[in-house]
UniProtKB/Swiss-Prot annotation:
<dbReference type="GO" id="GO:0005524">
    <property type="term" value="F:ATP binding"/>
</dbReference>
<dbReference type="InterPro" id="IPR002312">
    <property type="entry name" value="Asp/Asn-tRNA-synth_IIb"/>
</dbReference>
<feature type="binding site">
    <location>
        <position position="230"/>
    </location>
    <ligand>
        <name>ATP</name>
    </ligand>
</feature>
<feature type="binding site">
    <location>
        <begin position="221"/>
        <end position="223"/>
    </location>
    <ligand>
        <name>ATP</name>
    </ligand>
</feature>
<dbReference type="GO" id="GO:0050560">
    <property type="term" value="F:aspartate-tRNA(Asn) ligase activity"/>
</dbReference>
<dbReference type="InterPro" id="IPR004524">
    <property type="entry name" value="Asp-tRNA-ligase_1"/>
</dbReference>
<dbReference type="Pfam" id="PF00152">
    <property type="entry name" value="tRNA-synt_2"/>
</dbReference>
<feature type="binding site">
    <location>
        <position position="492"/>
    </location>
    <ligand>
        <name>ATP</name>
    </ligand>
</feature>
<keyword id="KW-0067">ATP-binding</keyword>
<comment type="similarity">
    <text>Belongs to the class-II aminoacyl-tRNA synthetase family. Type 1 subfamily.</text>
</comment>
<dbReference type="InterPro" id="IPR047089">
    <property type="entry name" value="Asp-tRNA-ligase_1_N"/>
</dbReference>
<dbReference type="GO" id="GO:0003676">
    <property type="term" value="F:nucleic acid binding"/>
</dbReference>
<keyword id="KW-0436">Ligase</keyword>
<keyword id="KW-0648">Protein biosynthesis</keyword>
<dbReference type="InterPro" id="IPR045864">
    <property type="entry name" value="aa-tRNA-synth_II/BPL/LPL"/>
</dbReference>
<feature type="binding site">
    <location>
        <begin position="544"/>
        <end position="547"/>
    </location>
    <ligand>
        <name>ATP</name>
    </ligand>
</feature>
<dbReference type="InterPro" id="IPR047090">
    <property type="entry name" value="AspRS_core"/>
</dbReference>
Length: 602
């Protein structure tokens, strides 16, 4: 391999017995057993046991002085371990290396934690990320990330895609998430924006005749962070010309099947199911449903319109209200304390409470139900609730009644919480498999009540369905987009659409978004001009590499599959970024800081 080492530690096996090897790595652990020193030597491939006998005094003295995380080099002979001392958990577990020479390449100060400590706080891990990355799970995660990226590249290369870089310094288009702005020193008062996606550039590449483009690139969004979000993230960005929506979906579905098979030996469905956005929201309250959870909403809005219970009848008679039931088979066993905990949980999503009915005996109707709300429901409503939900003896039905968004968010989250709970798994309400699907036919626009205007649900370059073009100027709320998301186990793995490729249609969409022609020309004139030069029909899709690897690795957060991530406050604890800069740098950029106004309290 090199003059310093002949093999990786974790790859030394019984096939090398009797051979002399040179190994380098870090001391995982050192044990002194009555005059014989054992060293667990670690590198990226794993561990090997090194034995140091005192009959080599100089080597043995060096072994006595080493400590955890010292970087060392050893030479020695591979030999079988004594019978009964084998370690079946290690690739090298049947052998050990009898050390001849030991050189300390670099000592280490005492680490702030043991690498095998599984109870570290994320703050500690991110502050000492260099050490955290030495841990076997983190080594595995980042190597898996590399493998996934390589499989993507191999697949797309075989399909004729060309890897083309697009600019990192671009024009700010304040639609959607906030841009990260970069001041221009040579153009005072002007700013670049870091890309939220290469969207417009890849469309212009289609106009330029590069009919199959991709890149694996960084994107940036200045938004509030969650477990699956980072201010900078990596996108597998793809665009094609002259393919239909179905052909685009088929192509990238096959890519994802291939990547999962080659990267982690998982066979995804031979054909992903397809679900309309409207159906996903009706059944699961989410446009990225986790199909592993075998619980669904039951629509009860119409049933509750005339009940003498304002908690239900109010939303049922409201234009933007919704009432649903969530039947949990066997849920009658859920305790009152657990119900109270669920009530508190849905409050996180804006729900004002959580009504419930335990079904003790269906045949008895009202008399077979246990709940404080039963007295507020008339017999016809009770009969219809039991019928629609398919309630059985021993079930519980939870209810959500509020604005549709609150109901979808709160009861949707409750569905997942129950399904993923120990009760849910023991009751067969959760299936531990890979469940991909396509969600299609998204609304083109959604109404922003605060700004009193329509906004693009995905982005303003998505094409409406051909038969819905007529609604752009008359009734934007009716427009359905040629948009599609690939969802896996409740995570959006990627999303895309067929794009608008005619300048006149793009202008109509801008007008529907209350972007007048003058503003559209100022912000997107270069795109509108490009579309006039015989732009081809085109569409594409972008996958979140971080999310894909997180799913494959079974990690809790995308921060576990990124080498140097930011916290949920968008800070890098290792380098202490972001940081203050000196006055000279600010003057060169023609920037003056304004003092933060103190918050006033009433």
């Amino acid at each position: 391999m090199s003059s310093m080492r002949t093999h990786y530690c974790g790859l030394v096996t019984e096939q090398l017995s009797g051979q002399e090897v040179a190994l380098t790595g870090w001391v995982q652990r050192r044990r002194d057993h009555g005059g014989v020193i054992f060293i667990d030597l670690r590198d990226r491939e794993g561990l090997v046991q090194v034995v140091c006998d005192p009959d080599r005094p100089e080597m043995f003295k060096a072994a006595e002085e080493i400590r955890n995380e010292y970087c060392i080099r050893i030479t020695g002979k591979v030999r079988p371990r004594p019978a009964g001392t084998e370690n079946t958990n290690l690739t090298s577990g049947k052998i050990e290396v009898l050390c001849y020479e030991l050189t300390v390449l670099n000592p280490s100060v005492t680490p702030p934690f043991q690498l095998d400590d599984d109870n570290l706080s994320e703050t500690t891990r991110l502050t000492h990320r260099v050490l955290d990355l030495r841990r076997p799970q983190m080594q595995y995660n980042l190597r898996l990330r590399y493998k996934v990226a390589m499989e993507v590249r191999k697949y797309l290369d075989a399909q004729g895609f060309i890897d083309i870089e697009t600019p990192m310094l671009g024009k700010s288009t304040p639609e959607g998430a906030r841009d990260y702005l970069v001041p221009s020193r040579v153009n005072p008062g002007h700013f670049f924006a870091l890309p939220q996606s290469p969207q417009i550039f890849k469309q212009m590449l289609m106009v330029s005749g590069f009919d199959r483009y991709y890149q694996i690139t960084k994107c940036f969004r200045d938004e509030d962070l969650r477990a699956d979000r980072q201010p900078e993230f990596t996108q597998i960005d793809c665009e094609t010309s002259f393919l239909t929506e179905q052909e685009i979906r088929d192509l990238f579905e096959d890519m994802m099947r291939t990547v999962f098979k080659n990267a982690i030996d998982v066979d995804l469905d031979a054909k992903f199911p397809v679900m309309e956005f409207r159906e996903a929201m009706a059944r699961f309250g989410s446009d990225k449903p986790d199909l592993r959870v075998k619980l669904e909403f039951t629509e009860l809005t119409d049933v509750m319109k005339d009940v003498d219970f304002k908690v239900f009848s109010g939303p049922a008679n409201s234009d933007n209200g919704r009432v649903v039931g969530l039947r949990v088979p066997g849920g009658g066993a859920i305790s009152r304390g657990e119900i109270d905990a669920y009530t508190q949980f849905v409050g996180i999503y804006g729900a004002k409470g959580l009504a419930w009915v335990k079904v003790n005996e269906v045949a008895k109707g009202r008399d077979g139900l246990q709940s404080p709300i039963v007295k507020n429901l008339h017999d016809a409503a009770i009969t219809e609730i039991l019928k629609r939900t398919g309630a059985q003896d021993g079930d519980i039905i939870f209810f959500g009644a509020d604005k549709a968004k609150v109901v979808n968010d709160a009861i949707g989250a409750l569905r997942l919480k129950i399904g993923h709970s120990e009760f849910g798994k023991a009751s067969g309400l959760f299936e531990d498999v890979w469940k991909p699907l396509w969600v299609v036919d998204f609304p083109m626009f959604e109404y922003d009540e605060e700004d009193a205007r329509w906004v693009a649900m995905h982005h303003p370059f998505t094409s409406p369905k051909d038969e819905h073009m007529q609604y752009l100027e008359t009734d934007p709320g009716k427009c359905i987009a040629k948009a599609y998301d690939m969802v896996l186990n409740g995570w959006e793995m990627g999303g895309g659409s067929v794009r608008i490729y005619r300048s006149d249609i793009q202008s109509k969409v801008f007008r529907a978004l209350k972007i007048n022609d003058e503003e559209a020309r100022a912000k997107f004139g270069y795109l509108l001009d490009a579309l006039q030069y015989g732009a081809p029909p085109h569409g594409g899709l972008a996958f979140g590499l971080d999310r894909i690897v997180t799913m494959m690795a079974g990690a809790d957060s995308i921060r576990d599959v990124i080498a140097f991530p930011k916290t949920q406050r968008a800070q890098d604890l290792l380098t202490q970024a972001p940081s203050a800069v000196d006055e000279k740098q600010l003057r060169e950029l023609h920037i003056r800081l304004r003092a933060t106004e103190p918050k006033t309290t009433v």
